Swiss-Prot record:
Protein's organism: Mus musculus
Primary location class: nucleus
Protein name stated in the entry: F-box/WD repeat-containing protein 7
Modified-residue entries (Phosphothreonine), positions: T208
Segments of skewed composition (Basic and acidic residues): 46-55, 133-142
Length: 710
């Protein structure tokens, strides 16, 4: 019986077979252990003879040498006590070898599939900043040292084979237990006692599950650690175990030190097989899928990609479409990305459109930051006139000029699709939604255009001076004029629905959210209107000079003035909440999103504010700041884009305020070249450039930062 066990054990060693299936990568083979722990020559010869005999299909130990008979019997008991295999005495060695060959063939196929999957994951991981990898490795090393669970196999191969290491291995440092004998903390669980009375080959531990493997078994996801019970336990084992349990913690450690010193390599290997899985607990696999996904949702996307390379089950979780939809929602990504795959996806690994959308957006952001600046598309038009207004929606660009025309351009091809002719004065304001374009002119009219055909649908009469500003909301547009009035129009019928009168000077800026109208004028006033009743709800007084810019989010009104200040108002009460100071000149442009305000000033600086607290978060300045007045700006959750009279367009980091790089630098910058307007989408930047002295040709520049997802 013992001889058959040893024969099967030798075959298991030779093929690497184990019923545990997924063995820890830190387990070592017996060849490595033989190099690490020195053995006497007789013992080495005996192991070599056993392996040679096993290869020829003979029973090991049938004819032991007389001098080694006792050692052989003792080795048989140890071999059986240190194996995780269950022996069926009726099965033959050839049958087991055939089964294991099939098992290894299947494992080889799985490894090939995993290599292909890992290549794809590596490509995705490359898209993210790897700067945190070193810190994660340091953390892993630190944790390994704290738990004392590292093994010999974790060492590099050259270190294992080093003569110095081999000679010094057996001089293992013992635990310094000290003079005091103190027990472990109450949280330490006692060792489990095996049930040796069972007649079966292997039985599960009868104690309450306390390890990861036990928990898996309790949940029906795996088997508990099985113990070898096919051999009668040695006399006095139970008494020794009871005595061991009665010792204090340090005394147990001392006993374990001595026990390890007396073990052979195969016994040390067995201990590692038992101990190491306890420090590699995959708690994610224990949880229901919903809870596992909830836990993974707290990871950063780059960490999710790393987690996906842990194992197949983790990759299935990390590819979950709903998980990536939440990540996209956090980044403001509204649509999933459906791409054609070049290869067939293996069963069980479903492509995530939301994950693809997230990775695409990350690549686009990287292009904005440090991608190669390719030559922009140049859209020439309007001769040498000034481009006074600029709109960009989808793949369509609309530019208005003081040459009395508007032009519609393709952002993809750069071609002028049509020229909108009809105004008899310069165009100074415009709005666009879908296929509708609305323009305001010095000829005192507004016109509604069909962007597809270039047809003028309506001409809106009523103002008695230049239409200087407008704001479109759904089917209505509100216009402000130098005649000091505001008018509300229905763009479908062309009718003037309401006239708002109250300002005593030209209206310079207007905002409309569909319920209330907010206007700023040269009379230093900001007014809040109910357009349906044509009544002024609040007159916001405080500025000491002309109001040039406005922002309105439905709760707060933000006004910028020539008096250098910016004021934040409560739209319901009309009270001034904050006065933002710091700029030195006219605030010519502002943008407000989610309580974050970015303001551009004629003093060449840009500031980022929190309107809830009134605090200035960042001032975009320094050696790379603009050298002249800021003409236009736009921002998203990552970047701020600014243009200036100095002929440059600059990119800044919204959170840190750091300068990233110049996106546009005109050769005539500083000598007359000006960037008048900018408009940006997620992937494109449109700049209206020219000059006031003829040094720069009037044109549009289109820069593309999109990526190709194959």
């Amino acid at each position: 019986m013992n001889q058959e066990l040893l024969s099967v054990g030798s075959k298991r060693r030779r093929t690497g077979g184990s019923l545990r299936g997924n063995a820890s990568s830190s387990q070592v083979d017996e060849g490595q252990m033989n190099r690490v722990v020195e053995e006497d020559p007789q013992q080495q010869a005996r192991h070599q003879e056993e392996e040679h005999t096993a290869r020829n299909g003979e029973l090991v130990g049938a004819n032991p040498r007389p001098g080694d008979q006792n050692d052989t019997q003792q080795g048989q008991v140890e071999e059986n006590n240190n194996r995780f295999i269950s022996v069926d005495e009726d099965s033959s060695g050839n049958q087991e070898e055939q089964e294991e060959d099939e098992e290894h063939a299947g494992e080889q196929e799985e490894e090939e599939e995993e290599e292909e999957e890992e290549e794809e994951m590596d490509q995705e991981s490359d898209d993210f900043d790897p700067s945190d990898d070193s810190s994660r490795e340091d953390e892993h090393t630190h944790n390994s040292n704290v738990t004392n669970c590292s093994s010999v196999s974790d060492l590099p191969a050259h270190q294992l084979s080093s003569p110095f290491y081999t000679k010094t291995t057996k001089m293992k440092r013992k635990l310094d237990h000290g003079s005091e004998v103190r027990s472990f903390s109450l949280g330490k669980k006692p060792c489990k006692v095996s049930d040796y009375t069972s007649t079966t080959g292997l039985v599960p531990c009868s104690a309450t599950p306390t390890t990861f493997g036990d928990l898996r078994a309790a949940n029906g996801q795996g088997q508990q650690r099985r113990r070898i019970t096919s051999v009668q336990p040695p006399t006095g084992l139970q008494e020794w175990l009871k005595m061991f349990q009665s010792w204090s913690g340090p005394e147990k450690l001392l006993a374990l030190d001595e026990l390890i010193d007396s073990c052979e390599p195969t016994q040390v290997k067995h201990m590692m097989q038992v101990i190491e899985p306890q420090f590699q607990r995959d708690f994610i696999s224990l949880l229901p899928k919903e809870l596992a996904l909830y836990v993974l949702s707290f990871l950063e996307p780059k960490d999710l990609l790393q987690a996906a390379q842990t194992c197949r089950y983790w990759r299935i979780l990390a590819e979950d479409n709903l998980l990536w939809r939440e990540k996209c929602k956090e980044e403001g990504i509204d649509e999933p990305l459906h791409i054609k795959r070049r290869k067939i996806i293996k069963p069980g690994f479903i492509h995530s459109p939301w994950k693809s959308a997230y990775i695409r957006q990350h690549r686009i952001d990287t292009n904005w930051r440090r991608g190669e600046l390719k030559s922009p598309k140049v859209l020439k038009g309007h001769d040498d006139h000034v481009i006074t207004c600029l709109q960009f929606c989808g793949n369509r660009i609309v530019s208005g000029s003081d040459d009395n025309t508007l032009k519609v351009w393709s952002a993809v091809t750069g071609k002028c699709l049509r020229t909108l002719v009809g105004h008899t004065g310069g165009v100074w304001s415009s709005q666009m939604r879908d296929n509708i374009i609305i323009s305001g002119s010095t000829d005192r009219t507004l016109k509604v255009w069909n962007a597809e055909t270039g047809e003028c649908i309506h001409t809106l009469y009523g103002h008695t001076s230049t239409v200087r500003c407008m704001h479109l909301h759904e089917k209505r547009v509100v216009s402000g004029s130098r005649d000091a009035t505001l008018r509300v129009w229905d763009i479908e019928t062309g009718q003037c629905l309401h006239v708002l009168m109250g300002h005593v000077a030209a209206v310079r800026c207007v905002q409309y959210d569909g319920r209330r109208v907010v206007s700023g004028a040269y009379d230093f006033m900001v007014k809040v209107w109910d357009p349906e009743t044509e009544t002024c709800l609040h007159t916001l007084q405080g500025h000491t000079n002309r109001v040039y810019s406005l922002q309105f989010d439905g709760i707060h009104v933000v006004s910028g003035s020539l008096d250098t200040s910016i004021r934040v108002w409560d739209v319901e009460t009309g009270n001034c909440i904050h006065t933002l100071t710091g700029h030195q000149s006219l605030t010519s442009g502002m943008e407000l999103k989610d309580n974050i305000l970015v303001s551009g000033n004629a003093d060449s600086t840009v500031k980022i504010w929190d309107i809830k607290t009134g605090q200035c978060l960042q001032t975009l300045q320094g050696p790379s700041k603009h050298q002249s007045a800021v003409t236009c700006l736009q921002f998203n959750k990552n970047f701020v884009i600014t243009s200036s009279d100095d002929g440059t367009v600059k990119l800044w980091d919204l959170k840190t305020g750091e300068f990233i790089r110049n996106l546009v630098t005109l050769e005539s910058g500083g000598s007359g070249g000006v960037v008048w307007r900018i408009r940006a989408s997620n992937t494109k930047l449109v700049c209206a450039v020219g000059s006031r002295n003829g040094t720069e040709e009037t044109k549009l520049l289109v820069l593309d930062f999109d990526v190709d997802m194959k």
